Amino acid sequence: MLDKNLLKTNSKEIREQLKSRSFNLDWYDEFLRLEKQLSTLLRTIEKLNEQKNINAKKAATTESDAQRKKLIQEGGLLRAELEKNEAKYNEIKEDFDYIYQRIPNLPTEDVPIGKDEKENVEMFKSRKPTFFDFKPLPHYELATKLEMIGLDVASKITGSRFSIYKKDGARLMRAIQQFCLYVNADKYEEYLPPVIVNKDSYYGSGQFPKFVEDVFKLEGTNYYLASTAEVQLVNLHRNEILKEADLPKYYTASTACFRSEAGSAGKDTKGLIRQHQFYKTELVKIVHPSTSKQEHEAMAKDAEKILELLELPYRRMVLCTGDMGFSATKTYDLEVWIPSENKYREISSISNCGDFQARRANIKFKDAISKKNLYVHTLNASALAHDRLFVAIVENYQQKDGSIKIPKALVKYFGKEYIK
């Protein structure tokens, strides 16, 4: 979340930034109005508490029974007035928090202004897209033909937007997982976290309460399936004060992820691009505020390194204000070339969240100079989405005879050079 004091300034710049994030400025005006009411009520409550304490001391020390009786009556009136104001405060605070918790992060100055993905800006392409002297098959046709996936049986077992990897398909997914972890193993500390998380964890990473409909809740419990390992890794240090000397911290985890894909009806209904259960390797950094910009650039290169080693065509996009995630202050997307669609598809998002998540999760460090406890900055990246990487390899490395060549860098993890 954002600093309340920053939001209270109601500057023209903040209004423009929120507008560029498609945030309703009427809500912002209501936030400011409620904040003033809360400040006034808080001063009243503090004054009433002070009067109540003075009254109680006088009642305890007076020797006059009549005076004591009068003071006790006054104390009762003060308590009643205090309870009334506290109830009013709590009522307004609930409305205030509802808005405050839904205000998105503010974009940095170099983020392009735009409404949606159509206004994202391409930074560069890595290499020429893959073209063939034959008509390439979409991944779901070729992988089914080679008995690598079972979409129909997954639908029978569970339902739509689920898949089963089998034989060389399961083997390729295992190789992808290992490769994604090992490429950055020298920099990031690996974790294997639970895929079930609580509400506080989702709140800390910024998904709740705004995106509560996008995740799976375990019926009859207060637990949820994690939509990304970012949730678990960001919350490793929730409610902690770190030593400045211990920064930065780099974490990685490879997990199954679960999303309800609410609002995605009709999108990518065939194949492995958009599923309820998918797999990815996540990177998370917890860093000193002064270094987060440089750490963001380095993190993008860490994700790109995987695509470079696999010799897959990709491009880097900087997301516009209207397409960035809720918690991000700046985001790069890596998009990999999908031959059957003749276009690039997202395979990684790399976001700098500034202190937005740290404020929600209450993650601080003790500054060595000022001795103050300050909020850290957090960053996250998919490195990479395994299912989409599977799609990219199958499609870009398909051969004229219907086989799939395994990228050189992946052969030692997969164990052979071709899938036939």
UniProtKB/Swiss-Prot annotation:
As recorded in UniProt, its EC number(s) are 6.1.1.11
Q: Which residues bind L-serine?
A: 228-230, 282, 382
Q: Which GO terms describe its biological process?
A: selenocysteine biosynthetic process; seryl-tRNA aminoacylation
The cross-references to SUPFAM superfamilies, in alphabetical order and at most eight, read: Class II aaRS and biotin synthetases, tRNA-binding arm
- Please give the chief subcellular localization of this protein: cytoplasm
Provide the residue positions that the database annotates as binding ATP: 259-261, 346-349
- Which terms does the record give in the GO molecular function aspect? ATP binding; serine-tRNA ligase activity
Enzyme type, top EC level: ligase
Judging by the UniProt lineage, the source's domain of life is: Bacteria
Q: Which Pfam families match?
A: Seryl_tRNA_N (PF02403), tRNA-synt_2b (PF00587)
Q: Which UniProt keywords apply?
A: Aminoacyl-tRNA synthetase, ATP-binding, Cytoplasm, Ligase, Nucleotide-binding, Protein biosynthesis
The Gene Ontology CC terms held by the record are: cytoplasm
Catalytic activity entry:
tRNA(Ser) + L-serine + ATP = L-seryl-tRNA(Ser) + AMP + diphosphate + H(+); tRNA(Sec) + L-serine + ATP = L-seryl-tRNA(Sec) + AMP + diphosphate + H(+)
Q: Where in the cell is it found?
A: Cytoplasm
Q: In which pathway does it act?
A: Aminoacyl-tRNA biosynthesis; selenocysteinyl-tRNA(Sec) biosynthesis; L-seryl-tRNA(Sec) from L-serine and tRNA(Sec): step 1/1
Q: Which InterPro entries match?
A: aa-tRNA-synt_IIb, aa-tRNA-synth_II, aa-tRNA-synth_II/BPL/LPL, Ser-tRNA-ligase_type_1, Ser-tRNA-synth_1_N, SerRS_1_N_sf, SerRS_core, tRNA-bd_arm
Q: What's its job?
A: Catalyzes the attachment of serine to tRNA(Ser). Is also able to aminoacylate tRNA(Sec) with serine, to form the misacylated tRNA L-seryl-tRNA(Sec), which will be further converted into selenocysteinyl-tRNA(Sec).
- Cross-referenced HAMAP family: Ser_tRNA_synth_type1 (MF_00176)
Q: Indicate the quaternary assembly.
A: Homodimer. The tRNA molecule binds across the dimer.
Its family remark reads: Belongs to the class-II aminoacyl-tRNA synthetase family. Type-1 seryl-tRNA synthetase subfamily.
Q: Per the entry's comment, what about the domains?
A: Consists of two distinct domains, a catalytic core and a N-terminal extension that is involved in tRNA binding.
* Protein name from the UniProt record: Serine--tRNA ligase
Origin species, per record, is Mycoplasmoides gallisepticum (strain R(low / passage 15 / clone 2))
Gene name? Answer: serS
